[in-house]
């Protein structure tokens, strides 16, 4: 992370588009603890894009 640079986090909708899955699928994965990790900002879920990409890469290797 660069000092002074704003942190860009993805919304559930952003991750949905990136992975090509529905928003509901992301919520289901979160409930089952199988999807990419997310954090809360207030009451909103946010995803670190680098973590989502790494999770996707790991899933691709496992397939």
Regions found by a protein language model. Give the residues of each.
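Short intrinsically disordered terminal tails
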Residues: 1-3, 57-63
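Polyanion-binding surface elements
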Residues: 1-28
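Short helix-start
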Residues: 9-14, 37-60
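Major-groove DNA-recognition helix of helix-turn-helix-type DNA-binding domains
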Residues: 19-46
């Amino acid at each position: 992370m660069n000092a002074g640079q704003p942190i860009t986090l993805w919304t559930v909708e952003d991750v949905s588009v990136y992975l090509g899955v529905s928003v509901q699928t992301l919520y289901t994965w979160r409930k089952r603890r199988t999807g990419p990790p997310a954090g809360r900002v207030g009451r909103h879920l946010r995803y670190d894009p680098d973590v989502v990409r790494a999770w996707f890469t790991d899933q691709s290797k496992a397939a």
